[in-house]
Amino acid sequence: MQSTARTLSVNKHIALVAHDHCKQDLINWCKTHRTLLAQHTLYATGTTGNLIQKEANLPIKSLLSGPMGGDQQLGGLIAEKQIDVLIFFWDPMNAVPHDPDVKALMRIATVWNIPVAMNMATADFLITSPSFAQETQVRIPDYDGYLKERLK
């Protein structure tokens, strides 16, 4: 498939997700980076979003809880180019009932080539990167070209 450029604006649309055993780590990370995060538009799965909003005092657009479809909602937003960055503190030591949804979210984030941090160290690197605070370009699949080719 051919690719095309997508511009990520200075104001990023950031998805925040955490498995149950990692929620407090993500909340603490959000508190640490509150000033930077407040400059962007934040989305989160339901429980995580409500906890971050309450404990870190950040405005969050909360979707459904992950097991109830929130991961799928985020995947849809990524495919529609409405999410620029995914911060997902996942628990590699515990399976969750919605593992297929989590895998689908990771897959779609990879397909649409958005920056993804899956642990605190990577999230720290990402948020302190010069690219985070400026307009930047990423390569994404050329879906329009793909569709035209398929419909010949």
Swiss-Prot record:
EC number: 4.2.3.3
Alphabetized UniProt keyword annotations: Lyase
GO biological process terms, semicolon-separated: methylglyoxal biosynthetic process
Classification via Pfam families: MGS
Chain positions recorded as substrate binding sites: 19, 23, 45-48, 65-66, 98
SMART domains tied to this protein: MGS (SM00851)
Active-site residues per Swiss-Prot or TrEMBL entry: 71
Domain of life: Bacteria
Main function: Catalyzes the formation of methylglyoxal from dihydroxyacetone phosphate.
Family classification: Belongs to the methylglyoxal synthase family.
Annotated protein name in UniProt: Methylglyoxal synthase
